[in-house]
Amino acid sequence: MADSYTELEKAVVVLVENFYKYVSKHSLVKNKISKSSFRKMLQKELNHMLTDTGNRKAADKLIQNLDANHDGRISFDEYWTLIGGITSPIANLIRQQEQQSSS
């Protein structure tokens, strides 16, 4: 990874690398994560952000709806949709905290 990457570029690289870390090397379906591995990834990698019951429920609902083609696996595009769905409420929370601290 280039040292000259911006913070945002580094964050994107981490998200991409994290997806491929959980793709099974023994999977017959390349570049997809099984739902069970995906849940493990969420528990391990997003544990602190998903400790809030609302966030966890939202993630569970997204997982149910994520598998657009119903193949039982999560593609990179489906993963990216989940990341967006999880970060949206977090962004709202951060914005609220900033507004409260500036009041």
From Swiss-Prot:
Keywords noted in UniProt: Calcium, Cytoplasm, Metal-binding, Nucleus, Repeat, Zinc
Residue ranges of domain EF-hand in the record: 12-47, 54-89
Molecular function via GO: calcium ion binding; calcium-dependent protein binding; protein homodimerization activity
Biological process annotations from GO: response to calcium ion
SUPFAM superfamilies, per the entry: EF-hand
Superkingdom, taxonomy of origin: Eukaryota
Binding site for Ca(2+): 67, 69, 71, 73, 78
Main location: nucleus
Stored Pfam families: S_100
Localization, UniProt: Nucleus, Nucleolus; Cytoplasm
Gene3D superfamilies in the cross-refs: EF-hand (1.10.238.10)
Alphabetized InterPro entries for the sequence: EF-hand-dom_pair, EF_Hand_1_Ca_BS, EF_hand_dom, S100/CaBP7/8-like_CS, S100_Ca-bd_sub
Cellular component terms (Gene Ontology): cytosol; extracellular space; nucleolus; nucleus; perinuclear region of cytoplasm; plasma membrane
PROSITE patterns membership: EF_HAND_1, EF_HAND_2, S100_CABP
Subunit organization: Homodimer. Interacts with TP53.
Domain writeup: S100A16 proteins, but not other S100 proteins, have only one functional Ca(2+) binding site per monomer. Upon Ca(2+) binding, undergoes conformational changes leading to the exposure of hydrophobic patches which could be implicated in the Ca(2+)-dependent nuclear export. Binds Zn(2+). Ca(2+) and Zn(2+) do not bind to the same site. Does not bind Cu(2+).
Task of the protein: Calcium-binding protein. Binds one calcium ion per monomer. Can promote differentiation of adipocytes (in vitro). Overexpression in preadipocytes increases their proliferation, enhances adipogenesis and reduces insulin-stimulated glucose uptake.
Protein name (record): Protein S100-A16
Native source organism of the sequence: Bos taurus (Bovine)
Organism placement in taxonomy: Eukaryota, Metazoa, Chordata, Craniata, Vertebrata
